[in-house]
């Protein structure tokens, strides 16, 4: 019987002692960069979600290594940020202490599972040698005008004691804004904050998605978040005033259908009118208690209050009423819309409520109609379709200086300050006049302190460290920035850090040597991780990469060529989580069933992108199959000279299917093919040696421990199983020479015959009438007609 605990312990030691997993780039081979989304090293340790994510990357990296690639598959730790700090506060520990302990535990668990990682390439975002370069990138962003301090309304989370980026704020089932981490309430609050101008790269972030092999769904998530819309701004003058309202519209061609102007509740004109109109003040108070979705959903009742001003239509010169509307928001365009009831459902509902004119503007399409059509009642746009009408009206607006073509984005600049302790310090100083000076000596170390509790006032705990905060240089006084960078900073460039890791330090990010390494290894070929990072980590990392490309640090435009989002592991239909008490510890199953069985089960559950239920009976079954594989080698004779025509065909079919499925990440189907092949092998007392060696090569991608043992004990090889090449198959030996076809008597199937491919009708009929089952049906009967479709079916009509 196969003892997985003894075998796995044995091979872990051998691999470590021999430095098998040490990365050495072979420049004669093509490169392949496989990457996992590196984890936050929590106290809970590795969970099944990690195993579901890391196993497919490991399987595929081994496959590419067998195919002759120089493969880099590294691992590291995303250790700064809120999770570590929250845990530190809850346990009254310092985050640095337990982070190191947790990392050691993670590494132990990872090694238990047989993942092929070179720990010499390990990165840790809290390592000063690492965050030196995070700080360097920030300085470059600042020097290039892409980082600045602004007075802005921020997402403030009192419970976490910090500001959050838009991407870190969720809307709960009740419509409340809550933090992604902990689901705590989030409110708007004015503060001075660092922002990074990600919006400068909005078009590149959309356009360059075409350079990637991402799923349409993942691309659309990013496109939707960026929210690009092309339209025009139009200026409506205010009657008897020098003021004007500038609206943004994605349909400027509908301008002749305008019957009102709608303003957001915080538009400057609304706030000005509020002081003179009690109705407006009451309406704004009502809106302040509503959630965004309660204001913008199509089926929500439209409400508004008429302002005591009139706008002048820029073309027709007609007076247009102005309303503050519940469904107009400040975060789109300029917080002002031109209401076109005939061309927008929400505008239509609003116009109906206030008895406003609804002018039909698209021929043969009653209001509201939002699709393409021929314009009517639209002056010089009459007879044009949407595209032509938009082009013509934009030209008119620009020529007459009453508007212009404009691109609008939902994406906002990245709020980059956090009022917490556990993060990268900003490498800047402020002089007594508030001017910013960048640090020359990097890294600027995070000072040690046990007082890490958020102040709750908007200041970081670092503000209490007066000796660190206040700096004297050449008799001048300076003050350090006391905010820290968000947890996303290190993950924006860590995939580059793996390539530059050199002992305990890193090659300079801006060196020629680094550029040459990046030329060889970028982009990352396969990146596997959760879809929850689609508008956080993935968007931020792409932004930083594009900036680094702009300043000639990296040679290419995109960091990650192919991304696969693995599914979740479910228990009773719910995601595994500590709060639900349904977490399954992988280490327990490594002990009880073995790492190979666990890895195989994880890949056999279904497609890696699917969220699938954890079934203990499933890993029990995989444990039995691992034993069955081992027993085959124990009980059968492995012979280099043995051959069997049928087994040879089955072997080549197996290798072909396994190779194709591996290439397409259909790992569950590869395992199915291995099971079928093992079943076939059990029919023989002898098995060909080469077949079994190559079977072990394929199996080793999933089950590295048992295959090393079989390779040594039964196949008598002194080299590692990983020293082999991926097996090849011979198409000629796969070709079928026979086929099974049904034989019908008077249209009913009575037998299935095996015939030679391409057999003539005479040959097939002769074979059929000699068959015992067919004889029983045609005895004492006359065959009046034979119907034969080659290689498909034979039908005998009898009387």
UniProtKB/Swiss-Prot annotation:
GO cellular component: cytosol
Enzyme Commission identifier(s): 6.1.1.4
Domain of life (superkingdom): Bacteria
Binding site for ATP: 578
Pfam families, per database record: Anticodon_1, tRNA-synt_1, tRNA-synt_1_2
Molecular function GO labels: aminoacyl-tRNA deacylase activity; ATP binding; leucine-tRNA ligase activity
Subcellular location: Cytoplasm
One GO biological process term: leucyl-tRNA aminoacylation
InterPro entries assigned to the protein according to its UniProt record, in alphabetical order: aa-tRNA-synth_I_CS (IPR001412), aa-tRNA-synth_Ia (IPR002300), Leu-tRNA-ligase (IPR002302), Leu_tRNA-synth_edit (IPR025709), M/V/L/I-tRNA-synth_anticd-bd (IPR013155), Rossmann-like_a/b/a_fold (IPR014729), tRNAsynth_Ia_anticodon-bd (IPR009080), Val/Leu/Ile-tRNA-synth_edit (IPR009008)
Catalytic activity from the UniProt record: tRNA(Leu) + L-leucine + ATP = L-leucyl-tRNA(Leu) + AMP + diphosphate
Main location: cytoplasm
Short sequence motif named 'KMSKS' region, residue ranges: 575-579
UniProt keyword list: Aminoacyl-tRNA synthetase, ATP-binding, Cytoplasm, Ligase, Nucleotide-binding, Protein biosynthesis
Entry similarity comment: Belongs to the class-I aminoacyl-tRNA synthetase family.
HAMAP family reported for this sequence: Leu_tRNA_synth_B
Protein name: Leucine--tRNA ligase
Gene this chain is encoded by: leuS
